[in-house]
């Protein structure tokens, strides 16, 4: 796509507004290539990749190259990254497996949009090291430990949202490897076992049911068959969506976040409910600023921004990705669709101790 030809989504976002939001992301990028949450804020590798994906969609390919090369330069020897960076310093030395895996989704998306295999080959060793690191933390029941603390000690449990994203990243990594003629090792096997646990043993994951991401992320990541995915979205809609205002980050509070709202729209598109996706994405207009940035969240009924006056790069990025999914403007618009083989993981049988 050329940023000169961005399509309008009437009542949601215009082509000019998409370009303005992309320029806002570019304005946040540091000379190193890092994309922080906001000016002077920290950066985490997952949201950094999300922002790079949005830049690719909007045609800012060189800026996306800089973002991915920043990530490559800071990858640790085992394939991981720290959780938060503030400029060139480490703000939080925890290592989150989901955060580490997402580069695979980012580079596969890059290939889908641009067709550029040269840059993808440059980045493939980064992707391979990251996915091999994440795969090494899979447990006997198929789940993947969610993090290691700053001393390198792994947590004993797994998270549903993070594991769903890891599943998606593993599948993207396999498609990337296939496109490049590179080996993907055991990534499919790891994804099969993880997908089985996600689809059939949700109790194996730490209970976080109040969070909207635990509701829609198994759908967004392609873990569930279409019928089950639609049922999941329908069952949780009233609990997690606040009237016409968007998605509650946490179901117990009327705090609507634009990033979760945009991701929910992506999940709705994934199951073929484009009209519902348009309706829910339209709620993000309340969050939009004139400069193309988006308020992170709005608390109701007072309609105050929370965190106060905070805009965030990942929110702007999620809006652009949802726009692309709905307008099909780039060849990467279906990165979060249900293209993955839904028959892979229902019957692992004796290899899954949770089935015994």
Predicted regions and their residues:
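Well-ordered alpha-helical scaffold segments within catalytic/enzyme domains
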Residues: 1-11, 49-61, 102-119, 164-182, ...
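Loop-centered beta-sheet repeat module
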Residues: 155-201
């Amino acid at each position: 796509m050329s940023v000169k030809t961005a399509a309008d989504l009437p009542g949601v976002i215009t082509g000019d507004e998409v370009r303005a939001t992309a320029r806002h992301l570019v304005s946040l990028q540091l000379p190193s290539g890092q994309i922080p949450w906001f000016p002077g804020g920290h950066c985490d590798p997952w949201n950094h990749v999300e922002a790079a994906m949005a830049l690719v969609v909007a045609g800012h390919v060189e800026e996306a190259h800089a973002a991915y090369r920043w990530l490559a330069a800071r990858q640790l020897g085992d394939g991981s990254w720290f959780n938060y960076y503030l400029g060139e310093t480490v703000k939080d030395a925890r290592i989150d497996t989901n955060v580490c895996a997402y580069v695979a989704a980012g580079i596969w998306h890059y290939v889908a949009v641009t067709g550029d295999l040269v840059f993808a080959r440059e980045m493939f060793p980064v992707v391979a090291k990251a996915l091999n690191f994440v795969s090494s933390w899979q447990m006997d029941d198929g789940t993947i430990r969610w993090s290691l603390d700053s001393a390198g000690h792994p947590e004993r449990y797994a998270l549903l949202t993070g594991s769903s994203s890891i599943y998606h990243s593993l599948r993207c990594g396999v498609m990337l490897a296939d496109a490049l003629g590179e080996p993907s090792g055991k990534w499919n096997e790891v994804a099969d076992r993880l997908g089985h646990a996600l689809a059939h043993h949700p109790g194996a994951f730490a209970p976080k049911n109040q969070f909207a991401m635990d509701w829609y992320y198994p759908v967004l990541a392609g873990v569930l068959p279409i019928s089950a995915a639609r049922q999941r979205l329908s069952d949780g809609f009233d609990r997690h969506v606040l009237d016409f205002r968007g998605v509650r980050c946490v179901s117990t509070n009327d705090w609507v976040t634009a990033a979760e709202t945009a991701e929910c729209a992506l999940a709705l598109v994934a199951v073929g409910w484009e009209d519902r996706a348009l309706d829910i994405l339209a709620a993000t207009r309340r969050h939009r600023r004139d400069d193309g940035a988006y308020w992170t969240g709005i608390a109701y009924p007072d309609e105050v921004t929370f965190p106060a006056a905070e805009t965030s790069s990942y929110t702007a990025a999620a809006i652009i990705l949802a726009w692309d999914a709905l307008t099909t403007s780039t060849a990467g618009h279906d990165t979060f669709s249900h293209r993955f083989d839904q028959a892979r993981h229902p019957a692992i049988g004796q290899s899954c101790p949770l089935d015994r």
